[in-house]
Amino acid sequence: VHRPGELTAADRAAWSALQRARPPAEAPQLHNPFLAPEFTLAMGACRRDVRIAVVREDGVPAAFFPHQRTPAGVGRAVGLGVSDCQGLVHGPGFTGDAVELLRGAGLALWEFDHLAADQPVFADGAGARFGSPVMDVADGWESYLAGLRERSPKFTRTTLAKERRLDRDLGPLRYVHDERDPELLRVLMAWKSAQYRRTGRGDRFAKPWITRLVEHLFHTGPGEVRGLLSVLYAGERPVAAHFGLRSAAVLACWFPAYDPAYAKYSPGLVLHLAMARGAAEDGMTLLDLGRGRKEYKDSLKTRELTVTEGWVTRRHPVAFGHRMRRAPVRALRNTVQGRPELFRPADALLKRMGQFRTGG
C-alpha cells in the first residue's frame, strides 16, 4: 500500500498500460480519466487520506486499487462524491478476492457510488444500479448530430435555433475547447457556486479541497489525462463554461455552468453541442455525462453505461457500524431520486429554499 507520491514512474506507466489493455469500444469505462493515475495523484496532492494498493503477480503490477481511508479502516472510492467512475484497474483475466484485497489494504470496508461495470472482484458488493448517459462521438461530429436529430428532433431544432439567436443578438459566437486562462476557471466556479445556492444544493466549491483539486487538474499538463476548461463566448463575454477531466478517449463531464443573465438562450446546451464537436475533432470517442436524473442528459445521450453503488466488507465491527449509519440515508436518497412523484416535489422544495437563501 502506497501513498500517491510513493508510486514509481514504472508503476504509473504500468497503471496506464492496464487502462489501455482493451480498446475504448470494448471497455469504455476503463478509459475514463477518473480511473487514471493522474486523478489519484491529484487527489493525493489535495488530501492526506489517499492510498493505492498495488497487487503484484511475479513482481509485476497486475492491479491498482486507489482509495481513501480513515484511521479506523473505513475505505471509500477515491474522490467519492465527486468522481463519476470508480473501481479496481486491472488487465483482462485478472481474478481476485475482495476480502483478501481489503485485508491487504488494511480496510474493514470499501464504499463506492460509481463503480464501473466489469468489476468481478466487487460484484458481490454492488447494490443499486444506475445509468450513466454518454454522448458517443466515435464516428465523428456529423454522425452524432444526425443521430441527435433523429432521437431528439424537437430538442435539436430548439437548441440550434437558440444558438443562432444568441449569435445574432450577442455574437459572434466563439468556442474555445481548451481555455488556458485561469481567470475563466474562477468565473466558472463562481457561476457554479451561485447555481448550487440557487437550487438549494450544497456548494461543492465551499470545500477547499475540491477547489484545490480542480485548480490542480487545470494546471496539470500537457498530457493525455488532465483537466479541460471549455468556454463559449458571445462577442467578448463568456456565457457558458465547463470544466471536465479528459483522457485520450473519454471526456468526463464534471462542472458545467452558465451566466444566468443569458438563460433564455440555453447557453449550457449550446456549449454541450460545441463540446461534442470539439471532443470528436480531438479524437475522443465518448463524453460521459455522469449518473443523475437530468432532462438535458436524456436529450443529448446516445446510450447509457452502467455504474453501481454499494460496499464490500470484511467481518469487522467497524464495517458493521459504518453500514448501520450509512444504509438508511442511502436507501432514502435513492428512493426519492428513483421515483418522479417524490423527486419533483423534493427538487422544487430545494429550489425554493435556495431562492429564499439567495434573496431570489
Task: Kindly label every feature range from the protein language model.
Residues D84-G91:
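The substrate-binding groove and active-site-proximal loops of carbohydrate-active enzymes
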Residues V1-D58, A62-G75, L115-S132, A146-K264, ...:
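A conserved beta-strand-loop-helix scaffold within acyl/acetyltransferase catalytic domains
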Residues C46, L80-D84:
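Short glycine-enriched loop/turn motifs at secondary-structure junctions
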Residues D58-G59, P92-G93, D136-W141, G235, ...:
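Short loop segments at secondary-structure junctions
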Residues V82, G106, A126-R129, D169, ...:
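A short, structural micro-pattern
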Residues G73, S83, G96-G104, R204-H322:
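Aromatic (often tryptophan-rich) hydrophobic motifs at membrane interfaces
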Residues P120-E150, A248, M284-P345, L349-G354, ...:
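Active-site/acyl-donor-binding loops of N-acyltransferases
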Residues F94-D139:
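Non-catalytic accessory segments adjacent to catalytic cores
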